[in-house]
């Protein structure tokens, strides 16, 4: 039983040691390549910082390289903060370019307009020659009217079908600058901006501004022409942009494996148009389609091989004249010297081949379930809605063009060849041309928010715009299983989903938590060689995102320094731009974004450092703690797991671990505070420090003064006691008097020798020499004090020894027993090991002998069989010989 008990004790000790050694503790890593989705504001960078819209953008130096990382991420062009910011920012720039500030509510009055013109353009119901009723009977094939740069009608603006611009002159009376005095004003309006009523007057019609009573309409205070701006988005310090670099990405990819990381997007150009996207940066030598995940909204990138372009022109001259309506209110009118011709656009390039490729690409799209016959896939215009929907809407240097695209659609679709019936009811629209007529409006619907704006007249003179068509905005409508329509759309926002839909914004989370077997204050401070920062750029450390956790952790020091250096560098760049452009911060949205970006970056860095500091890990790359890992079953695979994968697994533990780390740090600070109270006792060598001797002398002087004061008190008490016995020391004796007055007592003999004290004789009178006796008295008292201290210390030490002696003896006995038990167990193990060795040797010897014997028998048997086989011919020959004999 004793042996069994010893064995159980040893087993328990081994299990305890094993548990202590196998406990995992939380370790904090700073600089790990991990991230999470973010929604913070981005800022812009551009090469052309001379335009009004880019004055606050950072200078672009094309030094925005991309790094491929071995990770898998989800991308969605429609659920994307980058595209949403682009849409909002471009709208703000678009709105700022016109600077609306003057409300035109005074113009919501009845105006007297030229009836001939209102009838001509069909505003009063008396249509002139503008429309003709057409039946839906079959029509013969119509010849195409295709023009190019060499066609003379382009120069003369005299191409067939183009008419005069529909404009109407109106008059109205208002109270002007003089009180109670009306003034008549003359203005010229585009016909589509007015709504008129029948009037009894034969020469005038009663007209109003269209929708003036239902919307807040504003006019520009100053004219800024909406020219295209090229810029790129950049992430603030501490953030990054991921891009899906897969050619098969179609707007939504839950698992994109070809991912690159950068600090900025590609260059993009501001686009504001319906139906088409112009001058985009995503055009490639192929056609591809971004398809919304939950609807039929699409954005189609056209093949740049076909060189698709659109050229628009507003012919003839115009004169712009400001009209003062009242004090502080000015409206701009357009007096017409002669009837101008309408604006128009023509298309160049291989449009038919491009549209055919769009149809073929649509058939191959995984989301498409309609007919596979491209001849039954039609490119159509929307059925109705706002003018920006039914017409192709674009801006040409300040002029807002609304182009009727029927001629163009007939041309690219060859509609007269498809069954012989036209889908339009107007014979004028039954033509096939590569150019289209456009009308101009001064009151337009806003494309991002509900509302209307009145724009200033554009520049005077002839205006021409040239654009490259790079995309189509469309919705896929399945009429039935045999027919599909590609319906053009007015979703301007889709243009930016194509431009930036393959990006996603992430926040770098450099703080990682993982279990290790190292506990705080148990590591040895190994010396490290100083290294310079490995220049990978700000996001260089994310190149290790696809590496295993162990490999990434080796370079945490360099990664964290690179992270900090990149943050500081970008902070300085932003600060320089803000300082240079302080006076322009209110011009565009970028000034505010730059400030907000800087604040965001500072807040993120301070937040990370504050969190590390609350854990006691400030400015450390690897920080071991005393907090046990809360989930023993969740252990990282350091050789085959990335930090991003690990962070996703432990995300649910982060709050609990954070709380435990903070509590442990608070407890550690309390312990340090208690330890600092004993700071003078931690190192005994400090007692002999030269600076401590002054303090020791002070303590000695205070002790001496205390002893003297104590003795004075004792002397006073004794003196009072002697006075009660009949003695009276004289304190006020003259200097020559050296002896007290003798005081006689009775003749009774003392009961004990020396009862009355030392110094007097045994007679009837005594005296006390004050000066000498007091010195002797002090010496005796000091001797008594030292003797008492010595006796007390000796007794205390003796008692301590007597108390500790049994404990020490018991501890010594226990250690001897443990040593004896360990010696016996080691002897058992040695004996067992020797027995095991002997058994293995005996088994090996037996197996060897058995194998040798068996091999000998097998070899002999094989020899016999072989000899028998070899003897067969001889036996046959001998048999034949015997037969012949």
Swiss-Prot record:
Membrane-side (Extracellular) residue stretches: 24-700
Xref: Pfam families: GP120, GP41
Location of region: V3: 312-344
A GO CC annotation given for this chain: host cell endosome membrane
InterPro entries: Gp120_core_sf (IPR036377), GP41-like (IPR000328), HIV1_Gp120 (IPR000777)
One GO MF term: structural molecule activity
Renumbered residue ranges of the record's region V2: 170-212
Biological function: The surface protein gp120 (SU) attaches the virus to the host lymphoid cell by binding to the primary receptor CD4. This interaction induces a structural rearrangement creating a high affinity binding site for a chemokine coreceptor like CCR5. This peculiar 2 stage receptor-interaction strategy allows gp120 to maintain the highly conserved coreceptor-binding site in a cryptic conformation, protected from neutralizing antibodies. These changes are transmitted to the transmembrane protein gp41 and are thought to activate its fusogenic potential by unmasking its fusion peptide. Surface protein gp120 (SU) may target the virus to gut-associated lymphoid tissue (GALT) by binding host ITGA4/ITGB7 (alpha-4/beta-7 integrins), a complex that mediates T-cell migration to the GALT. Interaction between gp120 and ITGA4/ITGB7 would allow the virus to enter GALT early in the infection, infecting and killing most of GALT's resting CD4+ T-cells. This T-cell depletion is believed to be the major insult to the host immune system leading to AIDS.
Official protein name in the record: Envelope glycoprotein gp160
Gene name as annotated: env
């Amino acid at each position: 039983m004793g042996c069994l008990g010893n064995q159980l004790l040893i087993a328990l000790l081994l299990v305890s040691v094993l548990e202590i050694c196998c406990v995992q503790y939380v370790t904090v890593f700073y600089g790990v390549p991990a991230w999470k989705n973010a929604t913070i504001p981005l800022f812009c960078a551009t090469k052309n910082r001379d335009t009004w819209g880019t004055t606050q953008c950072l200078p672009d130096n094309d030094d925005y390289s991309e790094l491929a990382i071995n990770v898998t991420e989800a991308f969605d062009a429609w659920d994307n903060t980058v595209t949403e910011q682009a849409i909002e920012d471009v709208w703000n720039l678009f709105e700022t370019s016109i600077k609306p500030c003057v409300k035109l509510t005074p113009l919501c009055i009845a105006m007297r307009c030229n009836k001939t013109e209102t009838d001509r353009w069909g505003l009063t119901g008396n249509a002139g020659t503008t429309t003709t009723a057409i039946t839906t009977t079959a029509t013969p094939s119509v010849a195409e009217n295709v023009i190019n740069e060499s066609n003379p009608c382009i120069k003369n603006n005299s191409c067939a079908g183009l008419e005069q611009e529909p404009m109407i002159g109106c008059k109205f009376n208002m109270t002007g600058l003089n009180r109670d005095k009306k003034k008549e004003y003359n203005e010229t309006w585009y016909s589509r901006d007015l709504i008129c009523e029948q009037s009894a007057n034969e020469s005038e019609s009663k007209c109003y501004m269209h929708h003036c009573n239902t919307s807040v309409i504003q006019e520009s205070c100053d004219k800024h022409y909406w020219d295209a701006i090229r810029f790129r988005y950049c992430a603030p310090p501490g953030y990054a942009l991921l891009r899906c670099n897969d050619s098969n990405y179609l707007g939504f990819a839950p698992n994109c494996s070809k991912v690159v990381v950068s600090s900025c997007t590609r260059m993009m150009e501001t686009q504001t148009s319906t139906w088409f996207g112009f001058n985009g940066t995503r055009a490639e030598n192929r056609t591809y389609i971004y398809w919304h995940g939950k609807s039929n909204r699409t954005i189609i990138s056209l093949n740049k091989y076909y060189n698709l372009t659109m050229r628009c022109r507003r012919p003839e001259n115009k004169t712009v004249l400001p009209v003062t309506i009242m004090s502080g209110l000015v409206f701009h009118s357009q007096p017409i010297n002669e009837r101008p011709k309408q604006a128009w656009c023509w298309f160049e390039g291989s449009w038919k081949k491009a549209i055919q490729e769009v149809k073929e690409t649509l058939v191959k799209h995984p989301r498409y379930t309609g007919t596979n016959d491209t001849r039954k896939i039609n490119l159509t215009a929307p059925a109705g809605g706002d003018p920006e929907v039914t017409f192709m809407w674009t801006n040409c240097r300040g002029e807002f063009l609304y182009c009727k695209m029927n001629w163009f659609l007939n041309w690219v679709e060859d509609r007269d060849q498809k069954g012989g019936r036209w889908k339009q009811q107007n014979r004028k629209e039954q033509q096939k041309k590569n150019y289209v007529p456009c009308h101009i409006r001064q009151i337009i619907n806003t494309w991002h928010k509900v509302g209307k704006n009145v724009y200033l007249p554009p520049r005077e003179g002839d205006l021409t715009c040239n654009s490259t068509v790079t995309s189509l905005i469309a919705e896929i409508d399945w009429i039935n299983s045999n027919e599909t329509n590609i319906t053009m759309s007015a979703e301007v926002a889709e243009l930016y989903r194509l431009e930036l839909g393959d990006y996603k914004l992430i926040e770098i989370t450099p703080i990682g938590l993982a279990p290790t077997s190292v506990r705080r204050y148990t590591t040895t401070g190994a010396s490290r060689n100083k290294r310079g920062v490995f220049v990978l750029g700000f996001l260089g450390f994310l190149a290790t995102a696809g590496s295993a956790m162990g490999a990434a952790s080796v370079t945490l020091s360099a990664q964290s320094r690179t992270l900090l250096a990149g943050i500081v560098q970008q902070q300085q760049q932003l600060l320089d731009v803000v300082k240079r452009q302080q006076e322009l911060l209110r011009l565009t949205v970028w000034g505010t974004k730059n400030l907000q970006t800087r604040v965001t970056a500072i807040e993120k860095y301070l937040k990370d450092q504050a969190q590390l500091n609350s854990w006691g890990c400030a400015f450390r790359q690897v920080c071991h703690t005393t907090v046990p890992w809360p989930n023993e079953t969740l252990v990282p695979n350091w050789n085959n797991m990335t930090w991003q994968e690990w962070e996703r697994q432990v995300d649910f533990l982060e709050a609990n671990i954070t709380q435990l780390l903070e509590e442990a740090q608070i407890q550690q600070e309390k312990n340090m505070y208690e330890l600092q109270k004993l700071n003078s006792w931690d190192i005994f060598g400090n007692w002999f420090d030269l600076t401590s001797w002054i303090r020791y002398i002070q303590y000695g002087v205070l002790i001496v003064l205390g002893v003297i004061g104590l003795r004075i008190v004792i002397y006073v008490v004794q003196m009072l006691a002697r006075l009660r016995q009949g003695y009276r020391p004289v304190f006020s004796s003259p200097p020559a008097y050296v002896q007290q007055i003798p005081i006689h007592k009775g003749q009774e003999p003392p009961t004990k020798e020396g009862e009355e004290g030392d110094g007097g004789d045994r007679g009837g009178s005594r005296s006390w020499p004050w000066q000498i006796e007091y010195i002797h008295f002090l010496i005796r008292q000091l001797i008594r004090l030292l003797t008492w201290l010595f006796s007390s210390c000796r007794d205390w030490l003796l008692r301590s020894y007597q108390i500790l002696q049994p404990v020490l003896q018991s501890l010594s006995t226990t250690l001897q027993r443990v040593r004896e038990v360990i010696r016996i167990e080691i002897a058992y193990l040695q004996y067992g090991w020797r027995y095991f060795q002997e058994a293995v040797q005996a088994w090996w010897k037996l197996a060897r002998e058995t194998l040798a014997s068996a091999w000998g028998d097998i070899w002999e048997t094989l020899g016999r069989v072989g000899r028998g086989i070899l003897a067969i011919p001889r036996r046959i020959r001998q048999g034949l010989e015997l037969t012949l004999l």
